[in-house]
Design a protein with these regions (language model features):
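PP2C/PPM family metal-dependent serine/threonine protein phosphatase catalytic domain
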Residues: 6-21, 114-136, 140, 165-206
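Catalytic core of PPM/PP2C metal-dependent serine/threonine phosphatase domains
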Residues: 78-164, 198-205
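Conserved beta-strand-loop-short alpha-helix elements that form
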Residues: 35-46, 157-159, 205-226
């Protein structure tokens, strides 16, 4: 296994700067022993998702923690850290969701929704948030997470954004299946009631030259997927 360098960085997009909106993306990385984990989450731009910037941070935290726990438990039980099927990754995704929902409910309990937060929210969502039964919607976000170990790597993805793999021979590909439900400004989300059914996965036992993950704020800045992946390769080589 080659030695990998992992990094994560998020910046406020130009449109958010113009609209005086906070950065709604979050990213993070974790490294221990020979394991590299990176995650990125993209909050939703609609005014109805009033705490989406917090939701994306919670998603990154939940993903890094859940994946690290999975790898550590696998090693303690002398099991492969890169599963042979998606069954184990579905359990990881359930763990991520549970951790994310716990953070959301704790946040609402500590800091209930304020009138000024709800000023631009539609009447439909105001009623939902007032009922206390739809708190998670306020924190909606996408999520991509990738874990590299000495046995290969795996990825978990819900919503839009891209995962680009650069192979040793210079070939570029998107190894995680695309979700056709994600189109233009519509995306699946970790806050969906059926979110566990919307996760997609990749499991590989080989070692690419590099892996790049990013929110749709990056790939939407390019006129074509080819330009995006080419730029990603240039940046990573």
């Amino acid at each position: 296994m080659a030695e990998y360098y992992q990094f994560a960085h998020s910046v406020q997009g130009y449109n958010h700067i113009k609209a005086n909106k906070v950065c709604q993306d979050a990213s993070g990385e974790c490294h221990f022993e020979d394991v590299c984990i990176i995650a990125v989450a993209d909050g939703h731009g609609s005014d109805n998702y009033i705490r989406t910037d917090r939701g994306s941070k919670f998603a990154v935290s939940a993903a890094l923690t859940a994946i690290k726990a999975f790898v550590q438990e696998a090693r303690e039980n002398h099991l492969s850290t890169v599963p042979d099927s998606e069954t184990e990754l579905i359990q990881v995704s359930k763990n991520i969701l549970a951790r994310w929902y716990t953070q959301v409910e704790n946040d609402v309990a500590c800091e209930p929704f304020q009138p000024e937060e709800l000023a631009k929210v539609s009447e439909k969502y105001k009623q939902r948030y007032a009922s206390g039964q739809y708190n998670a919607k306020a924190y909606g976000t996408t999520l991509i997470a990738v874990c590299m170990t000495n046995e290969g790597w795996f990825g978990i993805h819900i919503g839009d954004g891209k995962c680009v793999e650069l192979l040793e021979n210079g070939t570029l590909c998107e190894p995680i299946p695309w979700d056709e439900a994600c189109e233009q400004n519509i995306t699946t989300s970790i806050c969906d009631s059926d979110a566990i059914e919307e996760f997609r996965y990749v499991i590989q036992k080989d070692f690419p030259a590099a892996i790049f993950i990013g929110s749709d704020g990056i790939d939407d800045s390019y006129s074509s997927c080819l330009l995006y992946t080419s730029d990603a390769a240039d940046d990573l080589i």
